[in-house]
Amino acid sequence: MGDEETIFTITEANLDSGLRGVPVGTCKTSFVDPIEGVHYVGYPVGDLANLEEEDVIYLLMHKRLPSPEESEAFHAELAHRAEEIPTGALRVLESLTPGSGHPMDWLAIGLMSLGAADTTGDARADAMNLIARMPELMARIFLLRGGKPEGLRPRKPELGLVENFVHMLGVEGDEAERMGRMLRFFFILHMDHGGGNLSTFSGKAVASGRASIYASIASAMNALSGPLHGRANQACLEFVQRLSLIHI
């Protein structure tokens, strides 16, 4: 122990700061360089921004980019898992009043409902199921909150995660293409951030007790719902929207 490097000294002031500035874990999938920005498994995120989102997810899960054959198989697995979504579990969302509550509250309820219906106990299977089913969950929440539950379109297995989300919302034509580009850029940019923010820390803390993937992610999303954390995501979306008017 005496030969180990000290990486941080905790002071009394740190204990009164809500862990601000205190390292709470390590991350092997990404890091943030103060000059060059975010890197995923050694790749600058800018080099990944034009890839399909599924391939970037594969990179984060396997620490390498997929071959064409692996990419095709990964897409097919996600499409199959999306088809198996327990839609009955999401009826709880239909009992909520359109426009009521915060969207993040709806998301946490939806996540826990999916988990109650289909937790397998296998971390990879549950993670893949959740990744595959998030587009439909988010589309349902958006339409139900807007009082338009009948607007949900059936998913298309040949479409990717972002494309299916846009499709299920009923967006078409040039608007669908532009929205898809913007959301894919936003999605890839937010996939991983070094593991030190509040939502990631909260999700890891809950997972450390061997809670399910669904419970852990719901906890992370509840942490994200606070304005001191989630407001940054909103500001980023506003920034991406401005960029989309220029050249995305």
What do the PLM-derived regions correspond to, one by one?
Residues 1-246:
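Hydrophobic alpha-helical bundle cores within soluble ligand-binding/oligomerization subdomains
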